[in-house]
Every structure is written in structure tokens, then in C-alpha cells.
Amino acid sequence: MVKSAEVRRRKKSWVGKVVSDKMDKAIVIAIERRVQHPVYKKYFKKTTRLMAHDENNDAGIGDIVKVTECRPLSKRKSCRLVEVVEKAK
């Protein structure tokens, strides 16, 4: 019998802008990235929205935050707030 080695991998982290903080202990962040069209070679922006766990309700709308992946906390939440990089003005 062959034993499979348990491989630990580094958790992914993202920096994004908070677009919603209406929920208790949860935020929605938008992560923008630039993608090149495969045929026309033009660059355009794509936005991914993630829900993240915010234990102390620190983040507000417009804040730039850093999140990291974690175990699934609910149906749509599998990220955790690490830090608020920049507060909104």
C-alpha cells in the first residue's frame, strides 16, 4: 500500500476594495485584474467579487483591504480579512 504524502500549500491572498459591508461580520470585496483578449490583444479589466469574514467589523465601504483564503466559513465565504491597508476618505 502506497502512502500519500500530505502536501502543505501556501494560502492565497488578495488585495481589493470593499464594495459592501451591510452584513454582520462579513464584507464583499472587488478584486480588479487586467486581462488581454486572446485574438485582439487589447487589455481590459475584469472584476471578481469575494465575500470575506470580518470578525470585528473593521472595514468600511471604499477601504482597501488584504484578505487570505481559509476553510469554508459559509456557503459563499471562504476568505478572512487580514488587514485594512488604506481607509476610505
Swiss-Prot record:
UniProt entry keywords in alphabetical sequence: Ribonucleoprotein, Ribosomal protein, RNA-binding, rRNA-binding
InterPro entries: NA-bd_OB-fold (IPR012340), Ribosomal_uS17 (IPR000266), Ribosomal_uS17_bact/chlr (IPR019984), Ribosomal_uS17_CS (IPR019979)
Pfam families: Ribosomal_S17
GO cellular component: cytosolic small ribosomal subunit
MF terms (GO), sorted A to Z: rRNA binding; structural constituent of ribosome
Highest taxon of source: Bacteria
One GO-annotated biological process of the protein: translation
This protein's record includes keyword Calcium: no
Keyword Ribosomal protein: yes
Self-association state and partner proteins as the record states: Part of the 30S ribosomal subunit.
Family from the record: Belongs to the universal ribosomal protein uS17 family.
Function: One of the primary rRNA binding proteins, it binds specifically to the 5'-end of 16S ribosomal RNA.
Annotated protein name in UniProt: Small ribosomal subunit protein uS17
Species name: Chlorobium phaeobacteroides (strain BS1)
